[in-house]
């Protein structure tokens, strides 16, 4: 039986919180800010939590992450 490996691309994008939830960054933050309002840009800077519907799939990819 082979060892399970952490999906490295996912490990770089998600961080586990103390309560076990997963933090993620927002999309649409690399360029083209002139089309976004100040409020949108400010809100995109903050991190968000992964939704419960995606949690199982992402936890499988991060199975070996501490």
UniProtKB/Swiss-Prot annotation:
Keywords: Ribonucleoprotein, Ribosomal protein. Pfam families: Ribosomal_L35p. GO terms for molecular function: structural constituent of ribosome. GO terms for biological process: translation. Residues 1-66 are annotated as: Disordered. Residues 1-16, 23-45 have a biased composition (Basic residues). One of its GO terms (cellular component) is cytosolic large ribosomal subunit. SUPFAM superfamilies: L35p-like. It comes from the Bacteria. The keyword DNA damage does not apply. HAMAP family: Ribosomal_bL35 (MF_00514). Belongs to the bacterial ribosomal protein bL35 family. This is Large ribosomal subunit protein bL35. It comes from Lacticaseibacillus paracasei (strain ATCC 334 / BCRC 17002 / CCUG 31169 / CIP 107868 / KCTC 3260 / NRRL B-441) (Lactobacillus paracasei). The lineage of its organism: Bacteria, Bacillati, Bacillota, Bacilli, Lactobacillales.
């Amino acid at each position: 039986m082979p060892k399970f490996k952490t999906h490295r691309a996912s490990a770089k994008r998600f961080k586990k919180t103390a309560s076990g939830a997963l933090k993620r960054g927002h999309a649409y933050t690399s360029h083209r800010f002139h089309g976004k309002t100040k409020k949108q840009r400010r809100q995109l800077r903050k991190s968000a939590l992964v939704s419960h519907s995606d949690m199982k799939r992402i936890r499988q990819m991060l199975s070996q992450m501490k």
